[in-house]
């Protein structure tokens, strides 16, 4: 008989304890004086198409400051949700914050509403909206209404607020965002989400009717009826307001319960972002919002100003994603170079743990989010050095971090901050 581990019956009085992984991390967590920074270049990852000489914007960019960090850090790839799944920005960021995006699902409307400073109440249903252009038959011809200026968005939202104050028995709240974006909140009794998007997601199609995602929910059915009523009331108000004579709504949902960042990680956290959605994501998990910055340099200066007040900073940079969605290789490359040029400001107070990554990939050839794992660079005294001279998709493929689920990046940052006690004897 082959030798092996001795086995025997479990004594009836011996309880079998199965610990959830999050509970284990919580049990092992120690307080820290370290400073942790997550720098997100939205949609950073890309793909090289066209043979051996093909490259990506990150590979083509001149990035001396990122290169200097790469020499001292560890690289790898992050899988935002699961193989083959293309994430939205919400799941992508929640994963980076260490929240399983399959367990904690949040509608984009909720995120945008919080980011714009709206206080959501129990029973509120929020939708992210953007103005669009429609032809005479109601077919969407431009999903972003020519990227109208924020001032025009504010003017149109003001008009809608005057003309459509309620639908059914629900109050309607309308808040303008940046550019063509705005938020609609339905405030009433007996409402819930999620609902399907009133958005065809491409030009050449009419706006679809919003329906409950979960069949049989009376509260969601009522909310869907309010969305339909809002369209009937609001579209006539926009008639003739080209290029913004229509609007799309998506991420229609109510606010879920999510444990706060400080409770989960014992870290005081702050967010430095420009766009409302990312402020909303941060607020959703209890981060403070450091307002007042518009440029990268200003964002990094806000970090310097607040350095001593917080343990963890989430800093968000949008342009890489925006140009990826436009399919503009050169502009995305330039956006990466602009980030690199501003990095010395951040490094005036170099964090103990610095993670640089994206929330997902936005390849220029695809002009949209994709399922490709995004590159990640982790720099700390204890991360170890892969000794690569650059930070790119190609070097990330060879890095010591390998391919990790994005939800574990936060735990790796904690480990590098020496925040975990030893597990077991």
List the predicted regions and their residue ranges.
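Basic polycationic patches enriched in arginine
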Residues: 2-5
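Feature captures the catalytic ectodomains and active-site-proximal regions of enzymes
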Residues: 8-11, 15-425
């Amino acid at each position: 008989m082959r030798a092996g581990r001795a086995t025997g019956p479990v004594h009836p009085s011996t309880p079998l304890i199965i610990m959830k992984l999050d509970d284990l991390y919580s049990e092992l967590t120690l307080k820290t004086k370290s400073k942790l920074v997550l720098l997100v270049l939205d949609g950073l990852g890309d793909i090289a198409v066209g043979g051996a000489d093909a490259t990506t914007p990150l590979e083509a960019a001149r990035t001396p400051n990122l290169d200097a960090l790469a020499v001292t850090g560890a690289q790898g790839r992050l899988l935002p949700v699961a193989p083959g799944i293309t994430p939205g920005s919400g799941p992508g960021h929640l994963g980076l914050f260490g929240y399983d995006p399959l367990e904690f699902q949040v509608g984009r409307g909720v995120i945008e509403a919080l980011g714009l400073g709206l206080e959501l109440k129990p029973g509120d249903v929020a939708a992210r909206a953007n103005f669009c252009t429609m032809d005479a038959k109601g077919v969407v011809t431009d999903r972003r209404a020519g990227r109208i200026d924020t001032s025009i968005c504010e003017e149109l939202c003001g008009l809608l607020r005057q003309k459509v104050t309620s639908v059914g028995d629900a109050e309607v709240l309308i808040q303008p965002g940046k550019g063509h974006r705005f938020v609609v909140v339905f405030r009433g009794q007996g409402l819930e989400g999620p609902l399907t998007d009133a958005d065809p997601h491409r030009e050449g199609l009419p706006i679809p009717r919003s329906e409950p995602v979960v069949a049989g929910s009376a509260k969601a059915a009522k909310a869907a009826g309010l969305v339909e009523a809002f369209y009937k009331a609001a579209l006539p108000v926009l008639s003739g307001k080209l290029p913004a004579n229509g609007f799309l709504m998506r991420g229609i949902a109510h606010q879920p319960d999510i444990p706060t960042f400080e409770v989960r990680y014992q870290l005081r956290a702050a967010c430095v972002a420009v766009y409302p959605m990312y402020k909303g994501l941060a607020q959703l998990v209890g981060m403070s919002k450091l307002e007042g910055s518009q440029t990268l340099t200003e964002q990094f200066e806000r970090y310097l100003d607040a350095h001593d007040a917080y343990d963890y900073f989430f800093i968000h940079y949008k342009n890489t994603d925006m140009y990826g969605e436009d399919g503009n290789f050169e502009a995305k490359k330039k956006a990466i170079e602009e980030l690199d040029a501003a990095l010395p400001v951040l490094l005036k107070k170099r964090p103990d743990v610095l993670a640089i990554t994206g929330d997902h990939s936005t390849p220029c050839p695809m002009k949209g989010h994709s399922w490709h794992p995004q590159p990640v660079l982790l720099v700390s005294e204890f991360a170890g050095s892969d000794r690569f001279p650059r930070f790119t998709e190609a070097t990330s493929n060879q890095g010591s971090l390998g391919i990790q689920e994005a939800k574990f990046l936060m735990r790796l940052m904690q480990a590098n901050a020496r925040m975990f006690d030893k597990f077991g004897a």
